[in-house]
């Protein structure tokens, strides 16, 4: 039983590590190197908590929702306007890779579309389906 539990734990650790590496590599396409190191972490954490991720990921997310939302909005507002669509697509792709197993894509799409309103930003007109992520 202990061997089975340690194998499951190792599998989850490997999945988390590969997902974070994928996010770090693809995020660098949209942001300068100084911003790429963890730029989307508060947004990703906010979306994961809002969409009701399981308790196994909650232990890694120690920040309150209000703080994560504020940090996410500050990051989104600091981006160039032409990056918003690409960033939303990147967020959607990351979310699909990491947490999509039990959640519907409509929930994620709705959340991504509400981000500009949540941050009091002018909504950006784009189709998430054109990203190949929905």
Curated annotation (Swiss-Prot):
Annotated region (Octapeptide unique to cereal prolamins), positions in chain: 69-76
Matches recorded under Pfam families: Tryp_alpha_amyl (PF00234)
Subcellular location: Vacuole, Aleurone grain
Gene Ontology CC, one term: aleurone grain
Family: Belongs to the prolamin family.
GO MF assignments: nutrient reservoir activity
UniProt keyword annotations, A-Z: Seed storage protein, Signal, Storage protein, Vacuole
Function noted in UniProt: Seed storage protein; serves as a source of nitrogen, carbon and sulfur for the young developing seedling.
Protein name as it appears in the record: 10 kDa prolamin
Highest taxon above the source species: Eukaryota
Species of provenance: Oryza sativa subsp. indica (Rice)
Signal peptide: 1-24
């Amino acid at each position: 039983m202990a061997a089975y539990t340690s194998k499951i734990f190792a599998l989850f650790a490997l999945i988390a590590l590969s997902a974070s590496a994928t996010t770090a590599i693809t995020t660098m396409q949209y942001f300068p190197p100084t911003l790429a190191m963890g730029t989307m972490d508060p947004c990703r954490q906010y979306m994961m908590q809002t969409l009701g991720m399981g308790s196994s990921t909650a232990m890694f997310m120690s920040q309150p929702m209000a703080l994560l939302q504020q940090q996410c909005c500050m990051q989104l507002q600091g981006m160039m306007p032409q990056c918003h669509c690409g960033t939303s697509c990147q967020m959607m792709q990351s979310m699909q890779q990491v947490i999509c197993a039990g959640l519907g894509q409509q929930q994620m799409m709705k959340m991504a579309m509400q981000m500009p309103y949540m941050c009091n930003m002018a909504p950006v007109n784009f189709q998430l389906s054109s990203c190949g992520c929905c």
